[in-house]
């Protein structure tokens, strides 16, 4: 009889941790829809659905008002298995003071932003010890907060909406020692996520600079070396039918549909799990910005350029440690 070893059980837990987070949105949304349709159509318990929708309306602004984090959820043992799967590692280049607020900008987005979630929406890679006195707020799409239970699960990790009003609230109403974490490349950057890629969708992303200037907070560049190696992606012929559809779809719904794949339940199989590749996120030093409540386009462009320069410097200083050649550069599109 075959008995699984401790290593087998550990691997199984790591795979489960990846699956439960990656599929949580799909499972929760589907369950909520089916259960509520059943309650309304086939039973007399429709008031349950009414109560749920009433609570949703009452609680609607919470993701833009600091969320509702639970430290116990951020410290779940399950997240340790999540980070060990790759594994994930974070490197700090400079201490930061809890007497100020910060916007940490994480690059690249990759296909799933696995490393950013592991470091800043959980505490299993040692964020609280690495940055004592700092409270991270992982900012994500507002759509994650539209569905009951899913919104509560996402908020429990300390995540909030990435809307402008949410950022303004966190930077003015929560005191100091707050770190807003944004992945500015977003879903638009997915199209460039192939193994070895160092291309970032950043030229048109200036809103985070404007917000930082408005509140006079420092920007912190961070680069996750290895994030784009977690999946393969099929690149369709430029100008072909599928490529035109991808661009049309992105224009319509702001999501670029990608044909990506990774490993399956076993290491040598094909599937949608990310490859077990180490990802190291290097957090740079803060770039101080002056407080300008209504910065002009020229001022925003100036500090956007300074931020890109700081990001390039961080990338060039550390790239050879992670298998990137000395001649390979960061490409900004």
Curated annotation (Swiss-Prot):
It is found in: Endoplasmic reticulum membrane. It is an enzyme of class 2 (transferase). It comes from the Eukaryota. It is a multi-pass membrane protein. Pfam families: DAGAT. Keywords: Acyltransferase, Endoplasmic reticulum, Lipid biosynthesis, Lipid metabolism, Membrane, Transferase, Transmembrane, Transmembrane helix. Expressed in Mueller cells of the retina (at protein level). Abundant in tissues rich in sebaceous glands such as the preputial gland and eyelid. The chain crosses the membrane at residues 15-35, 38-58, 130-150. Signal peptide: none annotated. Its EC number is 2.3.1.75, 2.3.1.76, 2.3.1.20. Monomer. Belongs to the diacylglycerol acyltransferase family. Acyltransferase that catalyzes the formation of ester bonds between fatty alcohols and fatty acyl-CoAs to form wax monoesters. Shows a preference for medium chain acyl-CoAs from C12 to C16 in length and fatty alcohols shorter than C20, as the acyl donor and acceptor, respectively. Also possesses fatty acyl-CoA retinol acyltransferase (ARAT) activity that preferentially esterifies 11-cis-retinol, a chromophore precursor of bleached opsin pigments in cone cells. Shows higher catalytic efficiency toward 11-cis-retinol versus 9-cis-retinol, 13- cis-retinol and all-trans-retinol substrates. This is Acyl-CoA wax alcohol acyltransferase 2.
């Amino acid at each position: 009889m075959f008995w699984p070893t401790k290593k087998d059980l550990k691997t199984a837990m790591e795979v489960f941790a990846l699956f439960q987070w990656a599929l949580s949105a799909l499972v929760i949304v589907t369950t909520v829809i089916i259960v509520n349709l059943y309650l309304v159509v086939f039973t007399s318990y429709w008031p349950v659905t009414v109560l749920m929708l009433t609570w949703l309306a009452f609680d609607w602004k919470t993701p833009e008002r600091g969320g509702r984090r639970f430290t116990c959820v951020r410290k779940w043992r399950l997240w340790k298995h999540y980070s060990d799967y790759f594994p994930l590692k974070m490197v700090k280049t400079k201490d930061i003071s809890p007497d100020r607020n910060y916007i940490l900008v994480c690059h690249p987005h990759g296909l799933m932003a696995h490393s950013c979630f592991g470091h800043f929406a959980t505490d299993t890679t040692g964020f609280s010890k690495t940055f004592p006195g700092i409270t991270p707020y992982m900012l994500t799409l507002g759509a994650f907060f539209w569905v009951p239970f899913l919104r509560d699960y996402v908020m429990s990790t300390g995540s909030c909406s990435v809307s402008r009003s949410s950022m303004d609230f966190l930077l003015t109403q929560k005191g100091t020692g707050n770190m807003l974490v944004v992945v500015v490349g977003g879903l638009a950057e997915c199209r460039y996520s192939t193994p070895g890629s160092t291309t970032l969708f950043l030229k048109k992303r200036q809103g985070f600079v404007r917000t930082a200037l408005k509140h006079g907070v420092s920007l912190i560049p961070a680069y996750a070396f290895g994030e784009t190696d977690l999946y393969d992606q099929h690149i369709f012929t430029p100008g072909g039918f599928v490529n035109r559809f991808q661009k049309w779809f992105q224009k319509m719904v702001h999501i670029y549909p990608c044909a990506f794949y990774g490993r399956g339940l076993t290491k040598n199989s094909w599937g949608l799990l990310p490859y077990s590749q180490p990802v190291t996120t290097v957090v740079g030093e803060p770039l101080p910005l002056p407080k300008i409540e209504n910065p002009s386009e020229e001022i925003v462009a100036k500090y956007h350029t300074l931020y890109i320069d700081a990001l390039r410097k961080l990338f060039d200083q550390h790239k050879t440690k992670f298998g990137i050649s000395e001649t390979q550069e960061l490409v900004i599109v």
